[in-house]
C-alpha cells in the first residue's frame, strides 16, 4: 500500500526532530526503563492516522488517536495495542491533550476538500517548547493553521518554539522503498488490464 511509506516516515521524521540536536525537546518516543515514553497525538483515525499510531505504538510511545467518527473510534479501540487510546476530536479535547504531547501527527484527509485547521496558532502555546508537529495533510492545505509546505532540503521551521515538519512529498525521502511500494500496489491492476 503506497501510504505505508507516508505514515511510517511521518512518525520516523517526528521522532528525529524531537532529538535535541535537531531542535526538539530531547525526548525518545519509546522511553527507557524507568523513564516515561514520549506522547504522540494523531489527528485523524483513517488509513494514515491508524497506521501512524501503530508505528508510534510499536516504538513504545504513549499514543492517542483523535477522530470525529464514533464507529471508527470503536474499531480503533478494539484493534489497537494497549498503549493506544482513542478520543473524540474537538477543539476542547485537542486543547486538553496538547500540554502533555511531544509529537502531533496531522493525518486528517477529507477527499476532494481542503484539510481543516485543527490546531490554531493560539493553541501552539499549549505545547511545550521543542514539541514537533508533522503535517501529513500539507498537500491538502495542512491541518495546522501555521503550516506551510517545506522540502526535504529544508524540512522544518519553528513558530513559537514549536517545530513544524510539513514536507509535501514525505515518501520522496525514501525513494527506493516508496517506488517499490507503489509498484507492488499498482502492478496487479496493470496485469489485469493487459489481460483484458
Kindly give the residue locations of the regions a language model identified.
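Rossmann-fold NAD(P) dinucleotide-binding segment
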Residues: 95, 99-100, 113-133
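Short, small-residue-biased leader/transition segments that mark boundaries at the very start
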Residues: 2-6
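Rossmann-fold NAD(P)-binding glycine/threonine-rich loop
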Residues: 122-165
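Glycine-rich phosphate/adenylate-binding loop
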Residues: 32, 40, 178-195
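Glycine-rich phosphate/diphosphate-binding loop of Rossmann-like nucleotide-binding domains
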Residues: 23-106
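Short glycine-/small-residue-rich Rossmann-like dinucleotide-binding loops
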Residues: 108-112, 137-138, 168-169
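Short glycine/serine/threonine-rich phosphate/pyrophosphate-binding segments
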Residues: 47-53, 71-73, 112-118, 141-144
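A charged, well-structured terminal subsegment
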Residues: 8-26, 184-193
Amino acid at each position: 500500500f503506497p501510504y505505508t511509506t507516508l505514515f511510517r516516515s511521518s512518525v520516523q521524521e517526528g521522532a528525529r526532530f524531537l532529538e535535541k540536536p535537531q531542535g526538539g525537546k530531547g525526548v525518545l518516543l519509546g522511553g527507557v526503563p524507568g523513564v516515561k515514553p514520549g506522547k504522540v497525538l494523531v489527528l485523524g483515525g483513517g488509513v494514515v492516522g491508524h497506521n501512524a499510531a501503530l508505528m508510534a505504538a510499536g516504538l513504545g510511545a504513549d499514543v492517542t488517536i483523535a477522530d470525529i467518527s464514533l464507529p471508527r473510534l470503536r474499531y480503533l479501540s478494539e484493534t489497537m495495542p494497549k498503549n493506544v487510546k482513542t478520543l473524540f476530536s474537538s477543539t476542547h479535547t485537542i486543547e486538553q491533550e496538547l500540554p502533555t504531547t511531544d509529537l502531533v501527527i496531522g493525518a486528517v484527509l477529507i477527499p476532494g476538500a481542503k484539510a481543516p485547521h485543527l490546531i490554531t496558532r493560539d493553541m501552539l502555546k499549549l505545547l511545550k517548547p521543542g514539541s514537533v508537529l508533522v503535517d501529513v495533510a500539507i498537500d491538502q492545505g495542512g491541518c495546522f493553521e501555521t503550516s506551510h509546505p517545506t522540502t526535504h532540503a529544508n524540512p522544518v521551521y519553528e513558530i513559537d518554539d514549536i517545530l513544524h515538519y510539513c514536507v509535501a512529498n514525505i515518501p520522496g525521502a525514501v525513494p527506493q522503498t516508496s517506488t517499490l511500494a507503489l509498484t507492488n500496489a499498482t502492478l496487479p491492476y496493470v496485469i489485469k488490464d493487459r489481460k483484458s
